A protein has these predicted regions:
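Active-site-proximal loop and beta-strand segments within enzyme catalytic domains
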Residues: 57-58, 79, 83-108, 138, ...
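N-terminal leader/targeting segments and the immediately adjacent pre-domain N-terminus
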Residues: 2-5, 13, 21-24, 30, ...
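Active-site-proximal alpha-helical segments within enzyme catalytic domains
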Residues: 144-148, 236-243, 296-319, 373-389
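Short, gly/Ser/Thr-rich active-site loops of penicillin-recognizing serine hydrolases
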Residues: 394-405
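Active-site helix/loop module of the DD-peptidase/beta-lactamase fold
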Residues: 156-194, 248-296
Length: 405
């Protein structure tokens, strides 16, 4: 064999070895990519999830890249900036909404506790203040739990597509009018339906009417095409809850408990209420249709720690300790901005252009309720922050984020 031929064969051999080596490296890279989560470069198996009960592991802020002194300053700021509303939440509701036509409280209420909160970093508790195990009303934070039940229905195939008209699923007349027949699940979830009607003796037009408008003008207003206008409206949110009840054929709190809350180790103390007149028959069984907030009483009554678990589930994209409880697709869907109001998704608030929480990243999304109740999910910093009865959310968030080194 000539030197030239030997050199050619050696080149082919070396090229073959190079291809094999590159293939091996590519294979290892793919395995590594699948095995590891983008969160802090940790594998899914190594991510910490708190066990059921009150033994949620605490870590020193410095162990997780935070400054304990600055974090304590955030806690002290939160304690000094409590919401100024009355402890008697029945009175607080009446003070805020009694100007509405035919207003009355028809769901349970209770006195609230002191301001409290918790900060979760990488799954661990790094700060906590006040009584975080106390069960309190959480008002419109309830909407994010309701949205989750809708996501579970989509995952289970009970809802085929959020763009389908709700009329295909609810056939008792509530979606029969020419306008209401156009309303989809998508419209109910992002509060752009402009549904017209009465539910639980509450007219859609009587919820948060424009100041100075006459009742005749409001009642006779021109309906807006579904999807064209955002209107925060608890009658229509309660309609979503009622519609989901028709789909699930079981009480929504049972669905939430079995599929989410029990599996993330939440306590058994939380409750999800409806109204005294929101009982319906489902397959011969008397079931209460729950509310999406505490506007007329009712809604979720829950502790800060249980809400933190719920927030952590969404931070982990619907996965809890290796089990996908709600699809990652749904977690992404709730964060899609509504075109007519880009700071709102599927019953989660978004921080588009930092309009809602100026101190936080634009990617932050959060549940929000009357009286200063929040569950904040910050993917960029691997944080869940739950604050109850705060008068200055941005101030609290600003100081927490300033503690990250």
């Amino acid at each position: 064999m000539s030197l030239k031929q030997n050199s050619s064969n050696l080149t082919k051999f070396n090229n073959s070895r190079l291809v094999k080596a590159l293939s091996s490296l590519l294979f290892l890279f793919l395995i590594f990519s699948l095995a590891f989560s983008p969160v802090e470069g940790k594998s899914k198996k190594s991510l910490y999830f708190p066990p059921k009960g009150d033994s949620w592991e605490k870590r020193k802020p410095e162990d997780l890249g935070m400054d304990s002194k600055l974090l304590q300053e955030a806690v002290e700021f939160a304690l000094k900036n409590e919401w100024k509303g009355p402890k008697d939440l029945k009175k607080a509701i009446e003070n805020s909404f009694s100007r509405e036509s035919f207003f009355s409280i028809i769901g349970p209420t209770k006195e609230r506790g002191e301001t409290n909160g918790i900060v979760i970093r990488n799954g661990y508790v790094v700060a906590e203040w006040g009584d975080t195990e106390r069960v309190d009303m959480t008002f419109s934070v309830t909407k994010s739990f309701l949205s989750t039940v809708a996501g579970l229905a989509l995952d289970a195939g009970l809802i085929r597509d959020v763009q389908e008209p709700v009329k295909k699923y609810v056939k008792d007349g509530k979606f029969d009018s020419e306008h209401n027949a156009k309303i989809t699940w998508h419209h109910l979830l992002n509060q752009t339906s402009d549904w017209s009607g009465t539910l639980w003796d509450r007219q859609d037009w009587a919820d948060r009417p424009p100041k100075g408008a006459t009742w005749d003008k409001i009642r006779n207003r021109k309906l807006i095409e579904p999807g064209k206008n955002f209107k925060y409206n608890d009658v229509r949110v309660n309609l979503l809850a009622y519609s989901l009840l028709q789909v699930w054929r079981l009480p929504l709190p049972v669905i939430l408990r079995e599929k989410i809350m029990d599996r993330i180790g939440a306590s058994s103390a939380w409750r999800w209420h409806g109204y005294e007149n929101s009982w319906v028959l489902i397959d011969g069984m008397k079931v209460q249709s729950v509310s999406g907030g505490g506007h007329w009483g009712g809604g979720m009554f829950i502790s800060t720690r249980d809400q933190a678990r719920f927030g952590l589930l969404f931070l982990r994209k619907g996965n809890w300790s290796g089990k996908q409880l709600i699809s990652q697709k749904w977690v992404s869907m709730v964060q899609v901005p509504t075109p007519v109001v880009p700071v709102y998704g599927y019953m989660w608030w978004l921080n588009t252009k930092k309009l809602r929480i100026p101190s936080a990243p634009e990617s932050v999304y959060f549940a929000a309720g009357f009286g200063g109740n929040y569950i904040v999910v910050d993917n960029e910093h691997d944080l869940v922050i739950v604050v109850r009865w705060t008068g200055d959310l941005d101030g609290v968030i600003n100081r927490i984020l300033a503690s990250i080194r």
